[in-house]
Curated annotation (Swiss-Prot):
One of its GO terms (biological process) is body fluid secretion. Residues 20-78, 125-138 form a propeptide. It comes from Manduca sexta. The modification Isoleucine amide is found at residue 121. Belongs to the sauvagine/corticotropin-releasing factor/urotensin I family. It is found in: Secreted. One of its GO terms (molecular function) is diuretic hormone activity. It comes from the Eukaryota. GO terms for cellular component: extracellular region. Keywords: Amidation, Cleavage on pair of basic residues, Hormone, Secreted, Signal. This is Diuretic hormone 1.
């Protein structure tokens, strides 16, 4: 497995070394690289070469060739805020209400057990003799 990692590192290093310019090369002319795109009138050559491939079924091809270059740049798609159809929030509310109901039942059972325990204090003989034991505790 180690040879695979070494091979990957070698490929990355060699690609980085081959992408770097030679030390004795002339500096790049950034003005030439950043030059503006072709004029709108010169886009006719692209339309004529693509007509054979797409034919008359592609009216968008002519529309793109006739649009000015500035109108195609800088438009971000507007994100519409649609109402959410997620059930996460209602489910979390239901979970919370269920846990509160469970806690309420546990507290009620503990209170009843404590009440029964406190009713039995000082009445040790009641639980052993059936004749003296009342039918229900309140």
């Amino acid at each position: 497995m180690m040879w695979w990692a070494i091979w990957c590192v070698m490929v990355v290093v060699s690609s980085a070394a081959s992408a770097a310019p030679a030390p004795d090369s002339a500096p790049m002319d950034l003005v030439q690289i950043d030059s503006a795109g072709p004029d709108d009138e010169s886009l006719g050559y692209a339309v004529s070469s693509l007509e054979g491939r797409y034919g008359a079924e592609a009216p968008w091809l002519y529309l793109l060739a006739e649009m000015p270059r500035d109108s195609q740049i800088g438009r971000a798609a507007v994100k519409r805020r649609m109402p959410s159809l997620s059930i996460d929030l209602p489910m979390s509310v239901l979970r919370q209400k269920l846990s509160l109901e469970k806690e309420r039942k546990v507290h009620a059972l503990r209170a009843a057990a404590n009440r029964n325990f406190l009713n039995d204090i000082g009445k040790r003989g009641l639980q052993w003799s059936r004749s003296e034991q009342p039918s229900a505790y309140y």
